[in-house]
Amino acid sequence: VDLLPELITPRSRILALGQMSNVTGGCPDLARAITFAHSAGMVVMVDGAQGAVHFPADVQQLDIDFYAFSGHKLYGPTGIGVLYGKSELLEAMSPWLGGGKMIHEVSFDGFTTQSAPWKLEAGTPNVAGVIGLSAALEWLADYDINQAESWSRSLATLAEDALAKRPGFRSFRCQDSSLLAFDFAGVHHSDMVTLLAEYGIALRAGQH
């Protein structure tokens, strides 16, 4: 975020950034980034796929233009996701596909579309996916996400402190993230994951 004033040029039109890194757990300062971008006349797109389940962004308070996340990251089905967009921006967008309920009126000269968001939803919707994601969101609503995130961070800290006592340990954890990425000098990550799996410890290895 500190580099944005140097990177933004008069040709810059859109700033796309992730809410949270799924490698280090790092989170950019969205408020600062959005302020920089908007002052330059840019539109901001935030990828919330990794962050939505940890700390949902307040799109109105942060003045986010577009915010997207996938359903399976919230314990919902695959093949479904959510795109939030400011109404004036959605209305200004042209449909990328035609057909189905997105059409308002048809004539020999062409067709007119429904208003947003329906004009952007051509064809048969993913009904099963929508129902599944809705059920997942209802289930999540019964839990305190902030409390769960705090608990996850404490577990990550506990693991990091314990592993730091071992020689060759190197942590890539960002700040106080609930995600802990690490390696050990001289030990291949695939070997480490395979060995730990025999003790009932499930980890993910390799580049991502």
Which residues does each PLM region occupy?
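Pyridoxal 5′-phosphate
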Residues: 1-208
